[in-house]
Curated annotation (Swiss-Prot):
Record CDD domains: AdoMet_MTases
Gene3D superfamilies: Ribosomal RNA adenine dimethylase-like, domain 2, Vaccinia Virus protein VP39
Keyword RNA-binding recorded: yes
Name of the molecule in the record: Probable ribosomal RNA small subunit methyltransferase A
Domain of life: Archaea
InterPro entries: KsgA/Erm (IPR001737), rRNA_Ade_diMease-like_C (IPR023165), rRNA_Ade_Mease_Trfase_CS (IPR020596), rRNA_Ade_methylase_Trfase_N (IPR020598), rRNA_adenine_dimethylase (IPR011530), SAM-dependent_MTases_sf (IPR029063)
Cellular component aspect of the GO annotation: cytoplasm
Any one GO molecular function term: RNA binding
Annotated binding of S-adenosyl-L-methionine, by residue: 23, 25, 50, 71, 95, 110
EC number: 2.1.1.-
C-alpha cells in the first residue's frame, strides 16, 4: 500500500498542493483500521472527501457496494482515472463544501484540515449511519469536549446535540507525507437515536459562542443584533431567562434548547433551526 503510493508520486513527479491541505496518509495499518471501524458491507454506500492518490479509496472499494469520492484537485482525478479501474467508485470533481453530496450511509475520510469545520457541519445535516474521519488533533479534542472544558466550543455543542462522538486513535505527524505541523486523530461519529437528537437554532448558538466566557445574559445582550433584535428588547426578558448566569461554555445542548424555547415563546427568536439527521 505504501509502496503503491510512493510509486505513483514518483511516476507523476507530484508535489502536494498545500493550499488544498494535501497530506497523504502513508501507514497501511491506520487505513486498514479505519476501514474496519466503518463496518462496511456490500450494502453500504460510502462518501470519501479528498481521496488524494486513492490508497484509502482502493480499500473502501473492496468492502463497500458503492464509493463516491469528492476531489478538488483535477490532477488527482486524472491520476486516479489512469491508475485504477474501480467498477464501484464514482469520482466527483469539486469542492466538497460547495458541491451537492450524493446519497450515502457512511463516510470515511482523511479530511483536508482547512475544510474540517464546514464539512462536519454539512455532514450533520445529512442522514448517515457512521462516519470515520481523520482530523487535526486539536479539532478532534474540541469535538469531544464536555460543557465546562477548556476546549468546549460551538463545534462541541452542535456535534454532541445530534451525534455520539469518540476519539479512537491519535496519529503522529510521521504517519503522513508530507509531514504536517500538527498531530491528528481518528474520530468516529454515529447519529443519536432520533428521539435524542436536539435541533438547535444556529443563529442563537453562534450568538452565544461569540462570547463563550460571558454569562448567557451578557452574551445575548452583546449579540442581540445576530438574533434580529436589540439589547433593550433582550434586557426586558433577562429576569426569567433560563441559565442566565451560567457561562456560555458551560451550557449543554439541552440548556441551549431551554434558552431557545424561552426566546421563541417571547417573540425574540423567529428562525426555526435547520433540520438534519431526521
Amino acid at each position: 500500500m505504501r509502496d503503491r503510493l510512493f510509486s505513483i508520486i514518483y511516476k507523476y513527479n507530484l508535489r502536494p498542493n498545500r493550499t488544498l491541505g494535501q497530506n497523504f496518509l502513508i501507514v497501511p495499518d491506520i487505513i486498514e483500521r479505519n476501514v474496519k471501524r466503518a463496518e462496511l458491507s456490500e450494502k453500504d454506500t460510502v462518501l470519501e472527501i479528498g481521496p488524494g492518490l486513492g490508497v484509502l479509496t482502493d480499500e473502501l472499494s473492496k468492502k463497500a457496494g458503492k464509493v463516491y469520492a469528492i476531489e478538488a484537485d483535477s490532477r488527482m482525478i486524472e491520476i486516479l482515472q489512469r491508475e485504477y479501474s474501480w467498477p464501484n467508485v464514482e469520482l466527483i470533481k469539486g469542492d466538497a463544501v460547495k458541491v451537492e453530496w450524493p446519497e450515502f450511509n457512511k463516510m470515511v475520510s482523511n479530511l483536508p484540515y482547512q475544510i474540517s469545520s464546514p464539512v462536519t457541519f454539512k455532514l450533520l445535516k445529512h442522514e448517515f449511519e457512521r462516519a470515520v474521519l481523520i482530523y487535526q488533533l486539536e479539532f478532534a479534542e474540541r469535538m469531544i469536549a464536555k460543557p465546562g472544558d477548556r476546549n468546549y466550543s460551538r463545534l462541541s455543542l452542535m456535534v454532541q446535540a445530534k451525534a455520539n462522538v469518540e476519539l479512537v486513535e491519535r496519529i503522529g505527524r510521521g504517519a503522513f507525507w508530507p509531514r504536517p505541523k500538527v498531530d491528528s486523530a481518528v474520530v468516529v461519529l454515529e447519529p443519536k437515536p432520533e428521539k435524542e437528537r436536539i435541533e438547535l437554532n444556529e443563529n442563537l448558538v453562534k450568538a452565544l459562542f461569540q462570547h463563550r466566557r460571558s454569562t448567557v445574559a451578557s452574551a445575548l445582550k452583546k449579540s442581540a443584533h445576530m438574533l434580529g433584535t436589540d439589547k433593550k428588547s433582550i434586557k426586558d426578558y433577562l429576569s426569567s431567562l433560563p441559565h442566565a448566569e451560567k457561562r456560555v461554555f458551560q451550557l449543554s445542548p439541552e440548556e441551549v434548547l431551554d434558552i431557545e424555547v424561552y426566546l421563541r415563546d417571547n417573540g425574540l427568536l423567529s428562525q426555526k433551526p435547520e433540520k438534519g439527521l431526521n
